[in-house]
């Protein structure tokens, strides 16, 4: 690989300070950033590096690319993940686990995708975000998430399985 890259005019190597600069990323119109998550809460906060206090990876450039896509003319920031773990635990949760870090804030996410659909969270209220995320959660988790959303925000909103319909 190094021999291929060395003095190859077709390859441009740049420092991470440039490649991950949200301003540089945003100069690409319709830039789409697709990232993953370990867990997301009902407000759309994304944890991509730990489960609680147990670290799985470094933060990497997720927020840089999500922010760059958000600034890009016509850009989209997408988080895509399976709705449950291989042990059957929902990755969409009422709240992040204690000690979990928010890698990407709820305000930067446009689209969230699981195998059950895609929802646009951008500009939505917290209650709307909860309703939308519940709609793409694994069916086995929807009732618990619905209950948690109702307990958190009360009866003013309509959720999927409906404690208030």
Spans of features found by a protein language model:
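Conserved phosphate- and dinucleotide-binding cores of soluble alpha/beta proteins
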Residues: 1-165
């Amino acid at each position: 690989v190094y021999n291929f890259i060395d003095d190859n005019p077709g390859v441009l190597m740049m420092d991470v300070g440039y490649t991950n600069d949200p301003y540089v990323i945003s100069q690409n119109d319709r830039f789409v950033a697709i990232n993953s998550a370990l867990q997301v809460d009902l407000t759309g906060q994304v944890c991509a590096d730990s489960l609680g206090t147990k670290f799985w990876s470094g933060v990497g450039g997720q927020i840089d690319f999500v922010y760059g896509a958000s600034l890009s003319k016509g850009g989209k920031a997408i988080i895509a993940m399976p709705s449950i773990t291989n042990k059957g635990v929902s990755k969409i949760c009422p709240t992040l686990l204690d000690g979990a870090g928010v890698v990407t804030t709820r305000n930067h996410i446009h689209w969230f995708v699981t195998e059950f659909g895609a929802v646009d969270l951008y500009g939505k209220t917290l209650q709307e975000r909860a309703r939308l995320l519940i709609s793409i959660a694994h069916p086995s988790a929807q009732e618990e998430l619905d209950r948690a959303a109702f307990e958190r925000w009360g009866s003013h909103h309509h959720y999927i399985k409906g404690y208030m319909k």
